[in-house]
């Protein structure tokens, strides 16, 4: 049996030292469980293109490199595909304007705990000893210089006025920390009996909303210092259609149903103390459009070119939807790929395995409901800096 008391209390630990999608290339890794994110990203490429059209092009004789950043890049191939798309689109704009394209630089940024090694192994080789035009025309090669930048995007990461374009997808719903009041048993916001805020009390969800808005304010403040005049940002995060923050939409179904029930199973079986369960909270908040807009407006540095709720679809990729066991495995793997690192830090590897085994079993028993109802909505924001 795993230890009940010796593991890390995730709520009390700085998340940036710990939080990451599951690294490597195993069955439960993010690299092998991010196909749905890839499909959602592809469905939004037309919105990304619109944002890229708003970026100012430097037409000077010797322009500096065009610099793009993916914030919250994680460790799968999706970030590489997005950067490739950005570089090629901007290059086409230079060509259409009759301007020689500059060199391109891309920064992949995530928390220090991110598996950058797996990410860098996915990068195609850089075309060398040739001109930029030939680089951009080469298939299967990279036409931009790269670097990894570890650190929280809720703080400054780059020198002032050095970035042309920021991209961040499926990351801003992750909070910098679980609000302290949520894990304080003396607080009215204490999230007793739950590991997520879906269906929680008003004071609990208010604490999460305040944390999200404070984090987003810090994010915008940092980017406003780093982006060049005429630069832009394309941001995507989990969102919700309900005005009620206790209804967290797809995130609520992912973390507030079978995942929650699996924790309760461990408590009933005496494997985890109720207090230990209550000390674990998923640091995710799916905002409404109004939640998001209030922060952008208050910051005042960015013009909102587009701000919409976009239906992304299911986070699961299932080849045989009639196979309940495959649906259950996909659900459990999806949960584990994004939350497994936190769970294991909180209760240890052995109990973590037991937890996700129960998640899989419960999702298998409700496979049809999972396929029909587990749908994600995203907040999509196109912002420009002038």
UniProtKB/Swiss-Prot annotation:
Tissue: Expressed in seedling roots and leaves. Expressed in the stigma, funiculus, and vascular bundles in sepals, petals and stamens.
Residues annotated as binding substrate: 30, 33-37, 170-174, 334
Sorted UniProt keywords: Magnesium, Metal-binding, Methyltransferase, S-adenosyl-L-methionine, Transferase
Record Pfam families: Methyltransf_7
Reaction it catalyzes: (indol-3-yl)acetate + S-adenosyl-L-methionine = methyl (indol-3-yl)acetate + S-adenosyl-L-homocysteine
Co-factor binding details: Binds 1 Mg(2+) ion per subunit.
Cofactor(s) named in the record: Mg(2+)
GO terms (BP aspect): auxin biosynthetic process; methylation; polarity specification of adaxial/abaxial axis
One term of GO molecular function: identical protein binding
Binding site for S-adenosyl-L-methionine: 30, 72-73, 78, 108-111, 152-154, 169-171
Entry EC no(s): 2.1.1.278
Amino acids binding Mg(2+): 191, 195, 277-278, 280-281
Assembly behavior: Homodimer.
Sequence similarity: Belongs to the methyltransferase superfamily. SABATH family.
Note: Plant silencing IAMT1 are smaller than the wild-type, show epinastic leaves and smaller siliques, and have low fertility.
PANTHER family documented for this protein: S-ADENOSYL-L-METHIONINE:CARBOXYL METHYLTRANSFERASE FAMILY PROTEIN
The protein, known as: Indole-3-acetate O-methyltransferase 1
Gene source species: Arabidopsis thaliana (Mouse-ear cress)
């Amino acid at each position: 049996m795993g230890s009940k008391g010796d593991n890390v209390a995730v709520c009390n630990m700085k998340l940036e030292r710990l939080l990451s999608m599951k690294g490597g290339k195993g069955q439960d890794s993010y690299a092998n469980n991010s196909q749905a994110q890839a499909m959602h990203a592809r469905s939004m490429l037309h919105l990304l293109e619109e944002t890229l059209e708003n970026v100012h092009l430097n037409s000077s004789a010797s322009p500096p490199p065009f610099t793009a950043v993916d914030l919250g890049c994680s460790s799968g191939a999706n970030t590489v595909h997005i950067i490739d798309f950005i570089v090629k689109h901007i290059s086409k704009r230079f060509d259409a304007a009759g301007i020689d394209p500059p060199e391109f630089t891309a920064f992949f940024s995530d928390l220090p705990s991110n598996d950058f090694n797996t990410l860098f192994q996915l990068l195609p080789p850089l075309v060398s000893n040739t001109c930029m035009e030939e680089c951009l025309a080469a298939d299967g090669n990279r036409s931009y210089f790269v670097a990894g930048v570890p650190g929280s995007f809720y703080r400054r990461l780059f020198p002032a006025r050095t970035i042309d374009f920021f991209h961040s997808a499926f990351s801003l719903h992750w909070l910098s920390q679980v609000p302290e009041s949520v894990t304080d048993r003396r607080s009215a916001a204490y999230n007793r009996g739950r590991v997520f805020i879906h269906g929680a009390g008003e004071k609990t969800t208010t604490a999460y909303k305040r944390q999200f808005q404070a984090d987003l304010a810090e994010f915008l403040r940092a980017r406003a210092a780093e982006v060049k005049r005429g630069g832009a940002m394309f941001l995507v995060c989990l969102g919700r259609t309900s005005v009620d923050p206790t209804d967290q939409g797809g995130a609520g179904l992912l973390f507030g149903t079978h995942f929650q029930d699996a924790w309760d199973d461990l408590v009933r079986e005496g494997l985890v103390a109720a207090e230990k369960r209550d000390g674990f909270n998923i640091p995710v908040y799916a905002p409404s459009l109004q939640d998001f807009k209030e922060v952008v407006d208050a910051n005042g540095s960015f013009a909102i070119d587009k701000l919409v709720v976009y239906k992304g679809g299911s986070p699961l990729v299932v080849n045989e939807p009639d196979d309940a066991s495959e649906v259950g495995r996909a659900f459990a793997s999806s949960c584990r790929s994004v939350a497994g690192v936190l769970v294991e830090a909180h209760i240890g590897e052995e109990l973590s395995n037991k937890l996700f085994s129960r998640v899989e079993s419960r999702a298998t028993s409700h496979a049809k409901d999972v396929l029909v109802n587990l749908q994600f909505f995203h907040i999509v924001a196109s912002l420009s800096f002038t």
